[in-house]
Each structure stands twice: as C-alpha cells, then as structure tokens.
Curated annotation (Swiss-Prot):
Protein name: Uroporphyrinogen decarboxylase
A GO cellular-component term linked to this record: cytosol
Organism: Rhodopseudomonas palustris (strain BisB5)
Any GO BP annotation: protoporphyrinogen IX biosynthetic process from glutamate
Family, as annotated: Belongs to the uroporphyrinogen decarboxylase family.
Length: 348
C-alpha cells in the first residue's frame, strides 16, 4: 500500500509554486486577543516563564491552529531570548514591555559576552519538538529570531522607545562598538536558527521590526548585510533552509533587500506600494502580507475591502496571506474568523 505524499501549501509557495488559494497565518497569532492564551499566560506566571515552559509554550503555539486552521504555526517565543542567552538581564514589566541593562557606551559594549549559551534556550527547542509532534503534517512550523539591528535597538536603549533612536545614534557616534553588538548577534542568531531547524522548524523568519527607521546607507550596513550573513551562515550548514525576511518599513529598499540577502520570501507591511512589490519583488521571491492589523479591530466592510485588496494585489504571484505586522491585543476573534473565511473562499 503506497503512502499518500503530504504537501505543505506554505512550503510550496516559498519553494516556487503559486497556490490558487494562498496559505495564511498571522504574525503574533498566539496572543492576548485569545482567551485561551490569556488563561495559559496566567498559569505560566510571567511572560518569560511562558516562553521557557516548553509544554505551555507549545500549547499557546497550537491554540490559533486549533481555532482558525492556519497553514503555519510560529513557535511562541520572543526576539529577546538571544540577549538573555548572551547573559544579559532581560525582564518584562507588566504594561511596560521589555527591560534590559542598556549597552549605551563603548565601555559597556566591552562587557558583552560574545558566545551564546544555547543551553539556556533548550526550552524553546523542546517546545518546537512538542509542536512538531502534534501538528498536522501539512502544517508548516516556523522558527524565528530578531534581526541583529532590531535586537540591538533594545540592547542599546535597555527598552523599547517610540523611535529606537538610541541605537541609531550609537551607530553614528560609535560605529565600532555598535558593529561589535551586530557581529555578536549575527553569529548568535545563526547558531540559534540552526538549532531551531534541528528541533523541527520547517521555515525560519528574521524579524527586522525597526529596520525601516534607517536611511538607505545605514539600511544597507545594519539591516541588509547582517541579514545576508545570517542567511549565508545558516545555509552553509543547511543548504536547503527556507528563510523569510521581514524588514518592516523598508519600502523602496525592498528590491535591494531581497537581491542582496538571498531570502526565499519577504514579509511586507501595509504601507508597501503594491505595483513596486509585484514588479520588483514578487517576480523573484514569495511575498507575505500585508493586511493592516487595525482592520481586525474595525471589521465590517472595511475588513472585507482590505482582504480583497491584498488578494487582488498579490494573488497572481507567489503569495502567503498575512498581516503587515503583528495582530493587536484588542483585535476581534470574530473579525479574524471573517478574514479567514474570505481568504479561504478565494480562488485566483
């Protein structure tokens, strides 16, 4: 008796095969908009306790898959587990977000440990193994890390700020010290991503949430080049690794990003100009995105129009339906269901 070959629609798109109905998932799909997430988060204690409890991290990873039937699960974790594994103090204050001991001078950068302790991240790898064992074979499992520039913005400032200008300023005033942070994060990210692949991840995503704040010259130096080095480093060990880049706010620099980094797909935010993306990006790599997350609060005809616009803009090429950034805590479950139903009904 021959065994039926299982295909993963998500992987198919990234590998070069367009789908009539695009695969879909949402950034931050495991989150506070879900009552089951909030219950598990309370059970865990703190946010980091949830990240480092393999059983509970696996549970919240699977919750949106059970509820919405997405084509991909992304492991529940945080981009700041890498600084944690580098020996930096990382904590999450309720209502205030992440806090770290800032690396805001060359002398302080000199105290940065250059070697990542992957043992500290074993709970993440165990959570990946659990999720892999419980996911349907056609569902893709995504591992991830933060891009070096974005992670560095938190390490330099010691927290999130409105525009993350402390890191940008350090890059101008002390480029050597800032480059050391980036170099450490590049090497650490390569090792972390490789371990995620070993633990069962099918695809990797590199989140450069703050890359778009950089001018073009600095974008090349601090966003494109570090991402290129990570992609190259991962593929040196795993030549077939599938990697998605997300340089949020890159805009007109998206073509340069995909050309020079070597990513297989790029996630775009809702401000990206559709024709430019179709002509200069989607002809070369798969495109992921790009519904405005606020439409999952608004709902109604505005949401329907937003979904239709994304499908119209990108369905002719390789496309993964997603948001332009993470879903917000005040998003409506009913509106997510409305979005899912509309995307699933589409045939292009």
């Amino acid at each position: 008796m021959t065994q039926k070959l299982v295909t993963k629609p998500f992987i198919e798109v990234i590998s070069g095969k367009r789908q009539a109905s695009p695969p879909m998932w949402m950034m931050r799909q495991a989150g506070r908009y879900l009552p089951e997430y909030r219950a598990t988060r309370t059970e865990a204690g703190s946010f980091l306790d949830l990240c480092f409890n393999p059983k509970l991290a696996a549970e919240v990873t699977l919750q949106p898959i059970r509820r919405f039937g997405f084509d991909a699960a992304i492991i529940f974790s945080d981009i700041l587990v890498v600084p944690y594994a580098l020996g930096r103090a990382v904590r999450f204050e309720v209502g205030e977000g992440p806090r770290l001991d800032p690396l805001n001078s060359p002398d302080l950068v000199g105290t940065l440990n250059g070697a990542i302790d992957l043992g500290k991240l074993e709970p993440v790898f165990e959570a990946l193994r659990i999720v892999r064992s419980e996911l349907a074979p056609e569902t893709t499992l995504i591992g991830f890390c933060g891009a070096p520039f974005t992670v560095a913005t938190y390490m330099v400032a010691g927290q999130g700020t409105s525009d993350q200008h402390p890191a940008r300023l350090m890059a101008y005033q002390h480029p050597g010290a800032f480059a050391k942070i980036i170099d450490v994060l590049v090497e650490s990210s390569i090792q972390y991503l490789l371990k995620q692949l070993e633990a069962g991840a099918d695809v990797l995503q590199i989140f450069d949430t703050w890359g778009g704040i950089l001018p073009p010259r600095e974008f090349e130096k601090w966003c494109i080049e570090p991402t290129r080095r990570i992609v190259e480093g991962v593929r040196k060990v795993k030549p077939d690794a599938k990697i998605i880049g997300f340089p949020r706010g890159a805009g007109a620099l998206l073509p340069a990003f995909i050309e020079r980094t070597g990513v297989d797909a790029v996630s775009i935010d809702w401000t990206a100009e559709p024709k430019m993306v179709r002509d200069q990006v989607q002809t070369k790599v798969a495109v992921q995105g790009n519904l405005d997350p606020l439409l999952l609060i608004a709902g109604g005809s505005a949401l329907d129009q937003g979904v239709d616009d994304v499908l119209k803009n990108f369905s002719a090429g390789r496309h993964i339906f997603n948001l332009g950034h993470g879903i917000t805590p005040d998003a409506s479950i009913a509106h997510v269901e409305q979005m899912v139903k509309r995307v699933r009904a589409f045939r292009g």
